[in-house]
Amino acid sequence: MKQSMVFSPTLREVPADAEIKSHQLLLRAGFMRQNASGIYSFLPFGLKVLHKVERIVREEMERAGAVELLMPAMQAAELWQESGRWYSYGSELMRMKDRNAREFALGATHEEVITDLVRDEIKSYKKLPLTLYQIQTKFRDEQRPRFGLLRGREFLMKDAYSFHATQESLDEVYDRLYKAYSNIFARCGLNFRAVIADSGAMGGKDTHEFMVLSDVGEDTIAYSDTSDYAANIEMAPVVATYTKSDEAEMALEKVATPDQKAIEEVSAFLNIEADKCIKSMVFKVDEKLVVVLVRGDHEVNDVKVKNVYGASVVELASHEEVKELLNCEVGSLGPIGVTGDIEIIADHAVASIVNGCSGANEEGFHYVNVNPERDFKVSQYTDLRFIQEGDQSPDGNGTILFARGIEVGHVFKLGTRYSEAMNATFLDENGKTQPLIMGCYGIGVSRTVAAIAEQFNDENGLVWPKAVAPFHVHVIPVNMKSDAQREMGENIYNSLQEKGYEVLLDDRAERAGVKFADADLFGLPVRVTVGKKADEGIVEVKVRATGESEEVKVEELQTYIANILK
């Protein structure tokens, strides 16, 4: 492709609203442009990268036995109402009405549509297992779109769905697609980890996320320093043991703590360590209010609270709800005196506290010498806190460290969550009606492009891995007015294309500095510069990833490039 014919508008300045490298560079290099908040156009170079990621996804999915189809973006509300997600999914679901006032959603995901499709066609175990996938635009009304393609309102996604007669069949296909995902992200050149995850609104049981390691990632990965254990911090269980001290229990006492609300303030004011304080929080669990206790130096993990109750929705109670429940402000909450049908659950660490402190449910006061079970009753002690760096790894090997990650893939064992809700059944080998067992497997295709750009860049621009680069080679005649340089550039361009390389020829009448700056910004794997030594049959070859350059004779160029790109 000749650069003079390409639509690739570059920017010299960093756009003001672009916070992270991938967003900045994809805009500056002319790979995409924003149409509205969280909505982007892919320009020609960006689209070439997107198509290469798509191709890798298709190859690995088909190798794993999945078959491609395409489902509609507009989905009837009746299907979501049938599954129970029309109201539970939340405000991220984009809803609309047609001219006849019939309700629809723009697809955020396609479990309902695929289940409806398959239940009408698959009636016997003899047609199972079946794995179908699509690459389709998805829509989510993000409250705060940010980071370019990493959190948009419209994005390209590969979603696959598998259907089974037995759990063993699901396990087999799940493992196969897990490996396919690992292959996809490895082929894209990414540094990633597969981690244990929470299924969230999708439902189901076993689930893993594929996380690209990056400091700008919105998720925290907890991993062992000596083993392969890795989990989203939401899902990492705490296996610590707590020993109760043998100090004598002292008399409960209420003390004034004016304007002291945060644990750090209270512990400093009372000269009590944070690990002897009891942090009290009120959660709304499927409309039921629950008091949750953790140690002062720990944080409540709301996903674990949700899992204790098997709840659909867990959120912090509002200030108004807390005031009505306990007649106090949030900063003065405590478990003592909580009565009626309000349940108190606590993290294991709370049980070991002796002579601790807690809020007194009265503004400006706290209790000291608080002892669980003597001063208040707990209905259940369980794991309710976030794991911390330095904690023992849940697999018993090593200690936990943290890293940030960008989620690019997610695989779920859905089980019968959707098939039972939507009456998707088949006849088993004994002629009995059974619900279809399902799996679900998603990859953010456009998000993967951004994740690659986030991992592969330097101070001068993008540095694309060869598997996804828009072109393999960038040929730059420095002076297009020079017949020797122009003709040699054309000859190299044509000969490399004949060998199957994708080549970009910079045939613009621009200054050398502009051409080189754009070349660094585009980030193609190999740059061939045709300069003053063209008359001698010599060009300069530069490897973008390493910055290494070498003069090469034209007759040796193809072999030299082949060794770089092998």
UniProtKB/Swiss-Prot annotation:
GO cellular component annotations of the record: cytosol
Pfam families: HGTP_anticodon, tRNA-synt_2b, tRNA_edit
Catalytic activity: tRNA(Pro) + L-proline + ATP = L-prolyl-tRNA(Pro) + AMP + diphosphate
Assigned EC number: 6.1.1.15
InterPro entries per the UniProt record, alphabetical: aa-tRNA-synt_IIb, aa-tRNA-synth_II, aa-tRNA-synth_II/BPL/LPL, Anticodon-bd, Anticodon-bd_dom_sf, Pro-tRNA-ligase_IIa, Pro-tRNA-synth_IIa_bac-type, Pro-tRNA-Synthase_IIa_type1
Top-level taxon: Bacteria
KW Protein biosynthesis (keyword) present: yes
Keywords of this entry: Aminoacyl-tRNA synthetase, ATP-binding, Cytoplasm, Ligase, Nucleotide-binding, Protein biosynthesis
Compartments where located: Cytoplasm
Gene Ontology molecular functions: aminoacyl-tRNA deacylase activity; ATP binding; catalytic activity, acting on a protein; proline-tRNA ligase activity; transferase activity
Disulfide bridge partners, by residue number: none
Keyword Chloroplast in annotation: no
GO biological process terms held by the UniProt record: prolyl-tRNA aminoacylation
Job description of the protein: Catalyzes the attachment of proline to tRNA(Pro) in a two-step reaction: proline is first activated by ATP to form Pro-AMP and then transferred to the acceptor end of tRNA(Pro). As ProRS can inadvertently accommodate and process non-cognate amino acids such as alanine and cysteine, to avoid such errors it has two additional distinct editing activities against alanine. One activity is designated as 'pretransfer' editing and involves the tRNA(Pro)-independent hydrolysis of activated Ala-AMP.
Domain characteristics, as noted in the entry: Consists of three domains: the N-terminal catalytic domain, the editing domain and the C-terminal anticodon-binding domain.
Subunit structure and binding partners: Homodimer.
Family statement drawn from the similarity comment of this UniProt entry: Belongs to the class-II aminoacyl-tRNA synthetase family. ProS type 1 subfamily.
UniProt protein name: Proline--tRNA ligase
